[in-house]
Amino acid sequence: MSGEIKWLRQLNLFFVAMSFFTRIPVPSWVVIDSDKLNKASRYFGLVGLLIGLICALVFWLAQLILPASIAILLAMVAGVLVTGAFHEDGLADTADGFGGGWTVEDKLRIMKDSRLGSYGALSLGLVLLLKWQLLVELALYSPMAAVSALVAGHTLSRVVASSLIFSEQYVRDDDTSKSKPIAQDQQLNDLFILIASGIFVLLWLNGVAAFVLFITLWLVRILLGGFFRKQIGGYTGDTLGAAQQISEVCCYLVILAVGLS
């Protein structure tokens, strides 16, 4: 009986993580509160895996009757619809704040502004275009290459972004912030489970691609963490979104450059 209760508790945490990252409805019995959200960080990578599988499925079905370029676009649209452009919004806000603010206070204020500025629009456009082009090249090489890239990119990018929670300082004091509960007292075993989901996905790739991707994302994480500390002294929910988008692009770049060689 206790084993069943523990299993249901973990399933509840997975659904909490899914409700945080996506627009997918969760069962009515799921309990969502700050404490559950804090513990659900261990499953952020698995939610990324789910999102990647959905995008990969949309692409695979679409490419059966449509050109690869359109199929990839539909897969990207599916990702945006599933997540509500959660991470893309964070990227745009981060670009606006870092590009338009001089002081830490200015940057945080601009990032909280819901209006889209020129830096945000430019960064969002460039990242989306780059993701589309990279995925199209992979799809033209092999549909399965694009499928693998979508699954790996969505999963690993969320592992990288979420891992920053465990080492960086959360810098917003606003109690209404959606990300604040996940920043409180993270446990080491949560980090291990998060990393394990990333390692599981790396095993899908060939040995060289997996190794290069691991090293690349490790370096990206170090650079992003240092950059965020320099800019605002730590991280916010918006910078985690930016980290996810940047890491996703890096995944596609590495898989295209190394995984197909």
From Swiss-Prot:
Localization terms from the record: Cell inner membrane
Keyword terms, alphabetized: Cell inner membrane, Cell membrane, Cobalamin biosynthesis, Magnesium, Membrane, Transferase, Transmembrane, Transmembrane helix
GO molecular function terms attached to this record: adenosylcobinamide-GDP ribazoletransferase activity; cobalamin 5'-phosphate synthase activity
GO CC, alphabetical: plasma membrane
Pathway: Cofactor biosynthesis; adenosylcobalamin biosynthesis; adenosylcobalamin from cob(II)yrinate a,c-diamide: step 7/7
Disulfide bonds: none
GO biological process, one term: cobalamin biosynthetic process
Cofactor(s) needed by this chain: Mg(2+)
Catalytic activity: alpha-ribazole + adenosylcob(III)inamide-GDP = adenosylcob(III)alamin + GMP + H(+); alpha-ribazole 5'-phosphate + adenosylcob(III)inamide-GDP = adenosylcob(III)alamin 5'-phosphate + GMP + H(+)
Biological role: Joins adenosylcobinamide-GDP and alpha-ribazole to generate adenosylcobalamin (Ado-cobalamin). Also synthesizes adenosylcobalamin 5'-phosphate from adenosylcobinamide-GDP and alpha-ribazole 5'-phosphate.
NCBIfam families tied to this protein: cobS, PRK00235.1-3
The protein's name: Adenosylcobinamide-GDP ribazoletransferase
Species per Swiss-Prot/TrEMBL record: Shewanella frigidimarina (strain NCIMB 400)
Gene: cobS
